[in-house]
Amino acid sequence: VAALTWQEFPDCDQVIVEFATADGAPSIDPPTASSEFMRRVSVLRVRFGLEVTATALSDQLIDSALTERAYVVRGLDGQFFIDLHLANTAEARMTTQSSPGRLIVDLRSGGDPYPATPAVADLTVVVEPVPGLVSYPLTISGYSRHFEANVIARLRADGNPETQAVTTATDWTETWGEFTFDIPTGPEGRVELFVGQESPRDGSEEGVYLALEAGGPA
């Protein structure tokens, strides 16, 4: 992944992903790719095939009506994907172009409202869960750039001991690394979920906090 740019037109927004060869020359052909519209969390995910082995950028602010930011993530399978965080409801179409190789996402206003958005901090993005009703086991997924790729989840409720789980993301040096893990069981009722890291400087929590209503097993 060499670059990401965008354009605004009267009837749509266009996000363009450019690619380069290992020696830095523009790629002639685009990689294989597939897309998934995760409307529940206002994210359009574009997954790349085995041809994409590195990235020159990790994230990009996008100043357009329909898109807020793009994250380049190393997935759990080792392959890269880009998440486009959408600012407003949209319908999407993905196409590719050769000479030079590009991937183009056209976004047009429309569709149903998004129920939720990812929780975002400087080095942490939580895609699931979203604020509201949850059940156990509680699955936590997202991506991060924490020190040494460590990810901590802490579940807190008044009158209950803290529940903690830890995992390791797939990257932290080159780009964002995906993570997913479960908290098998925990307190019911109103709970607070922290996902992030302990600061390498002073040990304080750095990450996102979610207000949840926890029920029993699903």
Predicted regions and their residues:
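Ser/Thr-rich low-complexity repeats and stalk/linker segments
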Residues: 123-124, 128-218
